[in-house]
A protein has these predicted regions:
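Thiamine diphosphate
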Residues: 2-183
Length: 183
């Protein structure tokens, strides 16, 4: 069971969020043992926890999203189930790697992608990708779910089943405020 916390945001508004620590523990229970990715403030709590290196999993930072896809492929071929952490703005960088490597050769990975620019609320450079990221995933034939505290267990089960049965990447889209952020 993923544990939640109440965090204060803005002017005393309480928003429930998953703890990064409990979510990583849950992924490790599901046998995800290799993590890589490119930093994003919405995923900063996850990255902070992974950098602590107290886990029975390995975290290797990546310089670009397409390079992270390559690291995930290597980890999978070496026998480890990989997780890629990235901002949705990096989807354009890594689509070619996914379509010419993972999708053709059936190499799975769990992708945790932040949803910057959702509903036009973010810095201007994130708004276009925030509007089209899900359509890009669909067009590429990559399944996804929008992760929430309420559907976490169900979505993790679905992702694991798709990854194991179909040997394809599966994306969890993460909205701002779902995980604790650290700066």
């Amino acid at each position: 069971m993923v544990v939640s916390v109440i965090s204060k945001i803005g002017k005393g508004l309480n928003v429930s969020s998953l703890t990064s620590k409990s979510f990583i523990e849950r992924l490790i229970q599901e046998d995800y043992k290799f993590f890589t990715g490119v930093p994003c403030s919405l995923l900063s709590g996850l990255i902070y926890e992974l950098e602590d290196q107290k886990w029975e999993a390995r975290y290797v930072p990546s310089v670009r999203e397409d390079a992270a896809v390559g690291l995930c492929v290597g980890a999978y071929l070496a026998g480890t189930m990989p997780v890629l952490l990235m901002q949705n703005s990096g989807l354009g960088y890594c689509l070619n790697a996914f379509t010419s490597l993972n999708l053709i050769y059936k190499i799975p990975a769990l992708v945790i992608m932040s949803w910057r620019g959702k509903a036009g609320k973010d810095a201007p450079e994130h708004i276009i990708m925030g509007d089209i990221d899900r359509e890009l995933l669909k067009t590429a034939g990559m399944e996804y779910s929008v992760l929430s505290e309420e559907n976490c267990e169900k979505v993790l089960k679905k992702a694991k089943q798709k990854i194991c049965d179909e040997k394809l990447p599966y994306t969890l889209i993460v909205e701002k405020g779902l995980f604790d952020e650290r700066h």
